[in-house]
Amino acid sequence: MGAFVGIFFINIFQDRMSGQKLLLLAILIVAVAGGLFSLLHAFASINMKADQTISGTALNLFAPAFAIFTARMIQGVQQIQFTDTFHIDKVPVLGDIPVIGDMFFQNCYITTYIGIGIFLVAAYVIKNTRFGLRLRACGEHPGAADSVGVNVAKIRYAGVIISGVLAGIGGLIFVIPTSTNFNASVAGYGFLAIAVLIFGQWRSNKILMAGFFFGIMKTLASAYSAIPFLKSLPIPNELYKMIPYIATLIVLAFSSKNSQAPRAEGIPYDKGSR
């Protein structure tokens, strides 16, 4: 949903503005859209105490269908095209640093730095703030949190909305450097994000490493033709594109048993049961 709203916004306004200003504005728009869309999930799972897996799956099926329907209704085709004016050839000063400049500050997108910033802020908030402590408590033992005066429903609503905001931003960040022709799909990478969370064992530092690992897998799937050794191998193109998904299955097979999710994750809270 975030990818659709963001790319559609860029498609409409790219003739009036361009570059980083348009991209940053699009990110704000998708953050709001993602937060609003997540309210449907929050209401179903918190107020109605619906099964969160079913609610999430329903919304996940609805989002691409809504994107395709809306795109075809407005412009007659499923694909939404946009002009990539967001690529940064070199960050001033930082791009001139030997080795590091070539790796991190040349041929890049501002979304990379936004993603790193979001990770750092999220890691700090979860570990070092009152809200983070309450959020973890409502995921581990909501009854105990409720007994000391924490509004479990309010905190869980906040958690779901924040997740929606980040998911919306993530959808746009995925599409921008990948293609200039969005076809209402993010190729299942939202589910790979869940795999990153499980592989990272719900810990910030491990999630960072897991994200880096899956980033390498995605790079191999997308840019294998630029690597002479991989290009020379008699392997079909389709197999390279399967690398992130195959890696996900292998990683989850070996790590899912050791990954401890919050004990109350996915369980509706009934105040009368504590």
Each language-model region and where it sits:
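Cytosolic-side transmembrane-helix boundaries in multi-pass membrane proteins
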Residues: E140-K154, Y224-R274
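Transmembrane alpha-helical segments in multi-pass inner-membrane proteins
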Residues: P177, N181-Y245
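Alpha-helical transmembrane segments within multi-pass membrane transporters and channels
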Residues: M17-P64, F213, K218
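Transmembrane helix-bundle core of multi-pass membrane transporters
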Residues: A63-N128, F229-N237, S259, A264-R274
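Hydrophobic core segments of alpha-helical transmembrane domains in multi-pass membrane transport
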Residues: A3-F9, A31, P64-I68, T112-V125, ...
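Short loop segments and helix-boundary regions at transmembrane helix junctions
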Residues: L39-V93, N128, G188, I194-I207
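Helix-loop-helix "hairpin" substructures at the membrane interface of multi-pass membrane proteins
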Residues: F104-N181, S204-N205, M209
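Short, non-helical or kinked segments that cap or interrupt transmembrane helices
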Residues: M1-V5, I46-L59, R134, A158, ...
